[in-house]
Curated annotation (Swiss-Prot):
Allows the formation of correctly charged Gln-tRNA(Gln) through the transamidation of misacylated Glu-tRNA(Gln) in organisms which lack glutaminyl-tRNA synthetase. The reaction takes place in the presence of glutamine and ATP through an activated gamma-phospho-Glu-tRNA(Gln). GO terms for cellular component: glutamyl-tRNA(Gln) amidotransferase complex. This is Glutamyl-tRNA(Gln) amidotransferase subunit A. The keyword Cytoplasm does not apply.
Length: 481
């Protein structure tokens, strides 16, 4: 199943032009986003120009699969000539002089950029309540959060503002919002996609990801944005069609690992959805095997030591001098630094910078940062050992359905929202979230994790499931143009 391919057929047949399709999406955003607040910058003029170019390419018969397909980008991917804010006052007026590799690859495929999406400031958050531009609402219930940090990316696709969107995943920031908004989203293996031009949070964790309604669409998009990049030394080449190569193959004989201890304390409706999903995978020929996943609370602690440390280093560049917000009342250099950073950063960002500087202090380094890095290595080894027995590990994508705004203002409570997603980031492994059912009439998601560069196994597993048992058609009816 592929929404992209359905749009491709409409464009190629002449049923709709790229300009007409773009105008439909732009009109829907302008009409409906006031209540959702998913879009920071609407690129109407640029989008229509790109759509005109796409129509010319289609008329010449030189189109790719993605020519003329609209897309929205999380506002931490640099877009030449268009504001890139990272949802922060610090970058409120920053216009990137170049394109990120991710956005450039989309442009090169002929995609149409509709706009830039709201997010938690500098990708720090799990609710999308930490944005200089205001909180984002979940299209399923406007009083609830869409998840974070890529909440705008999830809400926009769920609302039907674009067929696909880009996001980033540092600790679950595409997978948890996908669960809350009824979408499929994937964080590929660390290094599969370039981080060049992506505003940094924690560089050894950050990875670009994709939101869509179907795993096939996510795979198509990941093929488009992945590959080698000379500007990112951590980016490795993956072969052409890496993510789509096995979509048509059945999954008979695949072994799914599950740690029952991670399921037993979940709400009853989510447990029921998990059980039904695993039963359906067994009907498709997969085998279920019990495994023991490393302690998730230790993973959470490890994550919230290392990532603030990396964030403190990365965000040191915002000093009010080179670019970004500058306090106009500072009387000397020291005051300029202090006032610009105090005013320019939001509370959650400042909290994580302070944690990061604390754990990196010479008196605390060995007790916190060094031990966390050692534990990261141990946990990665433990997870990789599990893959000697199984092809994928199944976990929930989130411990609950979307919760109400303001329910988790306590930082620790909010951090626990990522407890099931963080292991994939700690280990750099690929993981995909997909809808598995409903709890209290809201979507909930499951998640598969695989060993490094077995991304194709994840897209294969979920595509075969969605072709046979998925609930995406019901969800998509809420959003279809």
């Amino acid at each position: 199943m592929s929404y992209i391919k359905k749009l491709r057929a409409r464009l190629d047949s002449g049923e709709v032009t790229a300009v007409e399709l773009t105008k439909q999406y732009l009109a829907k955003i302008k009409d409906q986003d006031k209540s959702i607040n998913s879009v920071i910058t609407l690129c109407e003029a640029e989008a229509l120009k790109e759509a005109e170019n796409a129509d010319a390419i289609i008329s010449a018969g030189k189109q790719s699969l993605l020519t003329g397909i609209p897309i929205l980008h999380k506002d931490l991917f640099c877009t030449k000539g268009i504001k890139t804010t990272a949802a922060s006052k610090m970058l409120d007026n920053f216009v990137a002089p170049y394109d990120s590799t991710v956005t450039k690859n989309c442009k090169d495929q002929g995609m149409v950029t509709l706009g830039k999406l709201n997010m938690d400031e500098f990708a720090m958050g799990s609710t999308n309540e930490h944005s200089y531009y205001g909180a984002v609402s979940n299209p399923w219930d406007l009083d609830r959060v869409p998840g974070g940090s890529s909440g705008g990316s999830a809400a926009a696709v769920a609302a039907g503002f674009a067929p696909v969107s880009t996001g980033s995943d540092t600790g679950g920031s595409v997978r948890q919002p996908a669960s809350f908004c009824g979408l499929t989203a994937m964080k590929p293996t660390y290094g599969s996609t370039s981080r060049f031009g992506m505003v940094a949070f924690a560089s050894s964790f950050d990875q670009a990801g994709i939101f869509g309604h179907y795993a096939e669409d996510v795979a198509i998009m990941l093929d488009a944005i992945s590959g080698e990049c000379q500007y990112d030394s951590t980016c490795v080449g993956v072969k052409e069609n890496h993510f789509t190569q096995d979509l048509e193959k059945d999954i008979s004989g695949k072994v799914i690992g599950i740690d029952e201890s991670l399921i037993k304390d979940l709400p009853a409706q989510i447990q029921e959805a998990v059980s039904k999903t695993l039963d359906n995978f067994k009907k498709l020929g997969a085998e279920i095997k019990s495994v023991k996943v490393p302690d998730l609370k230790e993973a959470l602690s490890t994550y919230y030591i290392i990532t603030p440390a990396e964030a403190a280093a990365n965000l040191a560049r915002y000093d009010g001098i080179r670019y970004g917000y500058r306090n106009p009342e500072a009387r000397d250099l020291d005051e300029l630094y202090r006032k610009s950073r105090t005013d320019g950063f939001g509370e959650e960002v400042k909290r994580r910078i302070m944690i990061g500087n604390y754990v990196l202090a010479s008196s605390q380094y060995d007790s916190y940062y060094n031990k966390a890095q050692q534990l990261r290595k141990v946990m990665t080894d433990q997870i990789n050992q599990i893959f000697e027995q199984v092809d994928v590990i199944f976990m929930p994508a989130a411990p609950s359905e979307a919760f109400k705004k303001g329910d988790k203002l306590d930082p620790v409570s909010a951090y626990l929202s990522d407890i099931y997603t963080i292991p994939a980031n700690i280990s750099g492994l690929p993981a995909i979230a997909f809808p598995i059912g409903f709890a209290n009439d809201l979507p909930v998601g499951g998640q598969f994790m695989a060993k490094a560069f077995n991304d194709n196994v994840l897209t294969q597993m979920v595509t075969q499931y969605q072709n046979s048992y998925g609930i995406e058609e019901f969800i998509l009816e809420q959003a279809r143009i």
